[in-house]
Design a protein with these regions (language model features):
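Short beta->alpha connector loops
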Residues: 12-16, 132-133
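Small/polar loops that bind or transfer phosphate-bearing groups
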Residues: 11-12, 101
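Surface-exposed, charge/polar-rich loops and edge strands
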Residues: 1-6, 26-29, 37-150
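N-terminal targeting/leader regions
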Residues: 1-10, 17-19
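General beta-strand structural signal in soluble alpha/beta enzymes
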Residues: 10, 32-33
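A short acidic, amphipathic alpha-helical/loop segment
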Residues: 18-23, 140
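Alpha-helix N-cap/helix-start and coil->helix boundary motif
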Residues: 16-17, 106
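N-terminal functional module of multi-domain proteins
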Residues: 18, 33-35
Length: 150
């Protein structure tokens, strides 16, 4: 999945800093938002990050030096399709339902990207966490809940 992905959406979770750094080193194009989606979507192309600055760029304060704000229309034109999406989670059921993080921002991000045709059923969704965060509990699933694939 990751190896073949050219464009990856990575949520601004602190636990995903190393993933962002690795993606920049691996020359992946990264799409992200800020916390709360208050400033919309941002595109970070690998060539915009000077060699050796990948770690700084992976931090929320650092990435703002290299990202380019994108409307959804611009994002569709710039990247076309997002191959992989990665989000953090407080907990995940074995069936891929995230819970405990609150606010539903990832569900909203997915819905906006899906409506624009930037993500679809072939876009892989990964929940990043530790094995101890997988909880076999009954969770009420809402129609707008976006399940993870892995």
């Amino acid at each position: 999945m990751y190896k073949n992905a050219k464009v990856i959406f990575i949520t601004p979770d602190n636990n995903l800093e190393k993933l962002r750094e690795t993606a920049f080193r691996d020359k992946k194009t990264v799409v992200m938002t800020n916390y709360g989606i208050t400033r919309g979507f941002f595109l970070i192309r690998p060539e915009s990050i000077p060699e050796g600055k990948e770690e700084v760029a992976s931090l929320l304060d650092g990435v703002s030096r290299y990202w380019k704000h994108q409307t959804l229309e611009q994002l569709k034109e710039s990247v076309g399709h997002i191959d992989m999406l990665v989000t953090g989670a407080s907990a995940i059921t074995p069936s891929g339902i995230r819970f405990g993080k609150g606010h539903g921002y990832f569900d909203l991000e997915w819905a906006m990207l899906y409506t624009m045709g930037i993500v679809d059923g072939t876009s892989v969704i990964v929940g990043a966490g530790h094995d101890c965060q997988v909880a076999d509990v009954d969770v009420t699933v809402e129609e707008y809940d976006t399940a993870i694939d892995y």
